[in-house]
A protein has these predicted regions:
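Short conserved micro-motifs on helix faces and helix-strand junctions that flank
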Residues: 9, 68-70, 160, 233, ...
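Hydrophobic helical membrane-anchoring modules
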Residues: 179-324
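Solvent-exposed polar/charged
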Residues: 58, 83, 109, 145, ...
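Residue-level signature of catalytic and energy-coupling elements of molecular machines
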Residues: 6, 24, 81, 96, ...
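Acceptor/aglycone-binding surface of glycosyltransferases and processive sugar-polymer synthases
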Residues: 66-70, 74-84, 89, 101-183, ...
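Structured catalytic core of nucleotide-sugar glycosyltransferases
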Residues: 1-129
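Residues at helix C-cap/C′ positions in short coil/turn segments immediately following an alpha-helix
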Residues: 32, 114-115, 148, 225-228
Length: 324
């Protein structure tokens, strides 16, 4: 019997976590030829998410959980879940049912019978999404595909099923500053994309804000590209050429045509323009230096406070001691 692990990052999912498990179980029960296991990762939730995880783990014997000591972010939660997987196939999904488990049969068909290493999803249309957020999302994917070496279709989501080989390859990339969408693409492997229409979450409230999305976009581009650094170098060269041409024109007008140019106007414009370019360049450079600084510390990606994987390990140790 083939096994499938479901990696589910959770942050303040008190309202909908139990409902998510019950709805997902309906799909799992319709696929008796596969053995499913949940790996729920509590990313430092401020509500009762962890207590609900413990309750569910006592009710269903196929539920494992990991609870962080604080909020480390969704990327860390996904990485923690992937590290604890052992199954033939691994699914990464959210707990808000915006990633419908009803797609499992299609995913299984792709990775097991059609020869794909990964079956990923992309957003076809989303009800209730603001136009501003939609425009920002499209701009991000266009910039990312143009500036980085990884290519992602518009609307690409983390929700996907992957082969064991692909998961093991992803785990070899242990950087602290993670951007999983880019990592999924960077490792390669044959991927089938499924487009589906997403809907608003049924229970609870989204924890993603525009500031989080903007930070996520910056992280994605700077994790896989040095194009912003090259951009500042090109801008510097262009400004140098323009300045040189302007100086030559000014000298010709002054020496040969007798035209005098007011100095304060050009000086003020030049100072403001160069000041803006300098600040932008320092900011871009600082972003990359900051990433190097965080990686050089070599801190753990996450810290586990509670986990019932430890109970499993203790049982294995007891069995070994009993069997000699």
């Amino acid at each position: 019997m083939k096994t499938i692990d479901l990696v589910v990052p959770c942050y303040n999912e008190e309202a909908g976590l139990e409902h998510f498990v019950l709805e997902t179980n309906k799909v799992i029960n319709s696929l008796p030829e596969y053995s499913f296991r949940y790996i729920l990762v509590n990313d430092g939730s401020k509500d009762r998410t962890y207590l609900i995880m413990k309750k569910l783990a006592k009710t269903f014997n196929n539920i494992k959980y990991i609870s962080f000591s604080r909020n480390f972010g969704k990327e860390a939660a996904m990485y923690a879940g992937l590290r604890h997987t052992t199954a033939d196939y691994v699914v990464v999904m959210d707990a808000d049912l915006q990633h419908p488990p009803q797609l499992f049969p299609q995913m299984i068909q792709a990775v097991e019978h059609e020869g794909y290493d990964c079956c990923a999803t992309k957003r076809a249309e989303r009800e209730g999404e603001s136009k501003f957020r939609g425009i920002f999302s499209k701009l991000f994917f266009k910039l990312s595909n143009r500036l980085t070496d990884v290519k992602m279709p518009y609307g690409a989501m983390d929700f996907r099923m992957m082969s064991r080989q692909m998961v093991d390859s992803i785990l070899e990339l242990s950087e602290v500053q993670r951007f999983s969408k880019g990592i999924f693409s960077w490792v390669g492997f044959n991927t089938k994309w499924i487009a589906y229409k997403t809907v608003d979450r049924q229970l609870g409230q989204t924890t993603w804000k525009f500031s989080s999305l903007f930070k996520y976009a910056i992280e994605g581009i700077t994790s896989f590209s040095v194009a912003p650094l090259r951009f500042t170098a090109v801008m510097g060269f262009i400004i140098f050429v323009i300045s040189l041409i302007y100086i030559i024109i000014t000298l010709i007008q002054t020496l040969f045509l007798g035209i005098t140019t007011p100095g304060y106007v050009t000086t003020l414009c030049a100072i403001l323009f160069m000041g803006g370019i300098t600040e932008m360049s320092i900011g871009i450079l600082g972003e990359y230096i900051g990433k190097i600084y965080m990686e050089a510390k070599d801190r753990p990606i996450y810290i586990t406070k509670f986990s019932n994987f430890e109970d499993e390990d203790n049982e294995e140790k007891d069995d070994k001691e009993i069997n000699g």
